[in-house]
A protein has these predicted regions:
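GST superfamily/GST-like fold recognition
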Residues: 107, 111-116, 154-191
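GST-like domain detector, emphasizing the conserved glutathione-binding G-site
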Residues: 1-138, 145, 152
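Extended, well-ordered alpha-helical scaffold segments
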Residues: 132-136, 184-195
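Amphipathic alpha-helical interaction segments
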Residues: 74, 96-99, 163-164, 168, ...
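Amphipathic alpha-helical core segments of compact helical bundles
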Residues: 80, 102, 149, 166-174
Length: 195
């Protein structure tokens, strides 16, 4: 059994996607970030970076003591290795999956903490800041659009943890469901993200 420390954000959705698609048993442990639950000592013992998601796997492969993990990319990789699912087994395919997983982990802060914050949540709307992060977000959407023009999924022919990491951020954005920014970012122009 896996305990999933979760709140319904794009990063939280990544891990629930894996758990649901793999059919793994888990218990949802809400971490209400609006009320500051991420700063409580019990949660910090599992996720010292005070960010969710985090998991505790009470039945790790090979048995042994429970394993606690934080950071969505690390969790996805752990679950893929534990189950043998949603990651290529050959070296080249695995490298491709990890490349796109790490691309998302490095790029999403510009989308969420940058564009999303200043466009949707900042108390003062600063045009320069919004435009700067919008330009970077559109560059990232273009990277994905070009990749999906040549590949069924971001890491090749198969659905992987890279897709699970990317969709909650970029898929929702491309559908106009994140930050209400679809028209502003002209997401309809990224045809391969619309499929």
């Amino acid at each position: 059994m896996i305990d999933l420390y979760y709140w319904p954000t794009p990063n939280g959705h990544k891990v629930t996607m894996f758990l649901e698609e793999a059919g793994l048993d888990y218990t949802l442990k809400p971490v209400n970030i609006g009320k500051g639950d991420q700063f409580k000592p019990d949660f910090l013992a599992i996720a010292p970076n005070n960010r969710m998601p985090a998991i505790v796997d009470h039945a790790p492969a090979g048995s042994g003591a429970p394993i606690s993990l934080f950071e969505s990319g690390a969790i996805l990789l752990y679950l893929a290795e534990k189950t043998g699912r949603f990651i290529a087994r050959d070296v080249a395919g695995r490298a491709e999956v990890l490349q796109w997983l790490f691309w998302q982990m490095g790029s999403a802060p510009f989308l969420g903490g940058g564009f999303g914050h200043f466009y949707a949540y900042a108390p003062e709307k600063l045009a320069y800041t919004i435009d700067r992060y919008a330009m970077e977000t559109k560059r990232q959407l273009d990277v994905l659009d070009r990749r999906l023009a040549e590949s069924a999924f971001v890491a090749g022919a198969d659905y992987t943890i890279a897709d699970m990491a990317i969709w909650p951020w970029y898929g929702q954005l491309a559908q106009g469901a994140l930050y209400g920014a679809g028209d502003f970012l002209a997401v309809q122009d990224y045809r391969n993200l619309q499929r």
